[in-house]
């Protein structure tokens, strides 16, 4: 048998891990080939299984690190992936910073390393400009596809009274996790970029409930009992902070974090997480955070995230007249969405009436002249007056009051009345 270890063999990963670990230890022992982050934290060549990433200042330092890494790999009788017949190579260099700085040519096994401005790694696009623009764009495109998958699954599978609960589980497992992977560790994340991700979330709600863009955004979360993506990212970032603080304090990640915490610059991750701690009402004391077990801290963050979500959603609710008749004390799915005596269409209709998105002229007037009821032409066309509309009363036995729809326990008779009213109005159209 040949005296070699194959990459895909049983011992391949162990040999690979040992090799990259040896590189790091040699850098520490020699006190060289380490990038000084903010002139304080030493950043060794980063390694993940068989991937290597060296960080160095342009010039002599980058040339020296390049020679060191290639030499160490060749001494192990290993090779980096150089350009193939199509000119594609897994070995690239990326220049960060001013372009007028001298950036030397780097070689791998005698082959010039191509320069790139971006590189995809583990689902994230690393950009020379340090921005998340393309990452967000990719996540949005991915999210739109996931929304279509979820809606298709819901429409072609019978979930009975569990339809909306299943929909929210699919949202969390497929959509939220699909478009927010690793986002908690991104730096320089802009509010506008978070909003782009949340727009995909809103798209799913609109398709799920068959409502227009003018539907109050907060109604989706308050009625269906879920937390906005922006708040989810805040919670995940704070949980990652707990993970960092639990690491060995002499380690590279912890050293990098402390350096950034003590000397922050605009867009740094530590600035984002400090704002998250403030928003969620969690003390920024390292001692306090470390004192909590992983599970206890996770539960604390979950509770605080719900409180914060409720607070910001209620602020939005107070700015919308359409939501004035609804009251919320916590983030939870409203009872009518889980009832077994209501059809999916009846639940969607209830949502529209509760949020004043039902098809009445006054619900969509937006500053225009008053709209008159198309049936009797004797009153303003709004959903409240539909219960006393002469034309409707001649065709439907009205039981209950329109205000019943804003209660926690909505009578079945009231739901049936608004369904019949909607059917009559649709026939008139």
Feature-to-residue mapping (PLM):
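Conserved pre-motif C helix in the palm subdomain of viral-like polymerases
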Residues: 2-33, 175
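Conserved, non-catalytic sequence blocks in retroelement Pol enzymes and Pol-derived host proteins
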Residues: 4-16, 37-38, 57-60, 130-138, ...
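Mobile genetic element proteins and their domesticated derivatives, centered on retroelements
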Residues: 8, 20, 50-52, 80, ...
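Catalytic palm subdomain of template-directed nucleic-acid polymerases
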Residues: 43-75, 97, 128-131
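Basic, alpha-helical interaction scaffolds
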Residues: 49, 110-187, 243, 251
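Short, conserved micro-motifs composed of acidic
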Residues: 82-117, 138
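Family-specific functional microsites
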Residues: 152, 157-160, 315-429
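Extended C-terminal regions of large enzymes
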Residues: 177, 200-201, 212-357, 361
């Amino acid at each position: 048998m040949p005296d070699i270890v194959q990459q895909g063999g049983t011992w391949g990963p162990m040999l690979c891990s040992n090799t990259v670990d040896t590189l790091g230890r040699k850098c520490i022992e020699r006190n060289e080939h380490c990038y000084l982050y903010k002139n304080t934290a030493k950043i060794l060549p980063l390694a993940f299984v068989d991937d290597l990433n060296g960080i160095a200042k342009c010039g002599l330092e980058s040339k020296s690190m390049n020679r060191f890494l290639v030499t160490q790999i060749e001494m192990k009788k290993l090779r980096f992936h150089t350009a193939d017949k199509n000119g594609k190579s897994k070995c690239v260099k990326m220049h960060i910073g001013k372009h007028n700085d001298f950036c030397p040519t780097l070689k791998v096994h005698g082959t010039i390393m191509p320069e790139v401005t971006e590189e995809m790694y583990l689902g994230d696009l690393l950009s020379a400009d340090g921005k998340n623009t393309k990452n967000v764009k990719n996540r949005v495109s991915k999210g739109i596809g996931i929304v279509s998958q979820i809606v298709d699954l819901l429409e072609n599978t019978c979930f009975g009274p569990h339809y909306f609960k299943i929909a929210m589980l699919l949202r969390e497992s497929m959509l939220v996790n699909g478009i927010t992977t690793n986002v908690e560790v991104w730096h320089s994340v802009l509010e506008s970029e978070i909003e782009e991700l949340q727009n995909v979330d809103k798209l799913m709600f609109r398709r799920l409930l068959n409502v227009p863009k003018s539907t109050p955004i907060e109604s989706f979360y308050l009625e269906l009992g879920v937390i906005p993506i922006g708040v989810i990212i805040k919670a995940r970032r704070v949980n990652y902070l707990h993970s960092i603080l639990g690491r060995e304090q002499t380690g590279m990640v912890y050293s990098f974090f402390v350096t950034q915490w003590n000397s922050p610059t605009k867009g740094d991750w530590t600035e984002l997480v400090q704002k998250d701690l403030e928003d969620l009402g969690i003390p920024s004391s390292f001692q306090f955070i470390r004192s909590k077990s992983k599970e206890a801290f996770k539960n604390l963050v979950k509770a605080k995230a719900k409180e914060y979500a409720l607070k910001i959603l209620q602020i939005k609710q107070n700015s919308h007249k359409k939501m004035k008749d609804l009251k919320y004390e916590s983030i939870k799915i409203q009872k009518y969405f889980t009832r077994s005596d209501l059809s999916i269409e009846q639940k969607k209709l209830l949502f529209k009436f509760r949020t004043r998105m039902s098809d009445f002229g006054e619900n969509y007037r937006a500053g225009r002249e008053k709209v008159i009821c198309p049936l009797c032409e004797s009153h303003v066309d709004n959903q409240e007056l539909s219960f006393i509309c002469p034309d409707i009363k001649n065709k439907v036995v009205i039981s209950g009051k329109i205000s019943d729809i804003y209660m926690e326990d909505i009578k079945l008779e009231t739901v049936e009345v608004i369904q019949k009213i909607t059917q009559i109005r649709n026939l008139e159209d």
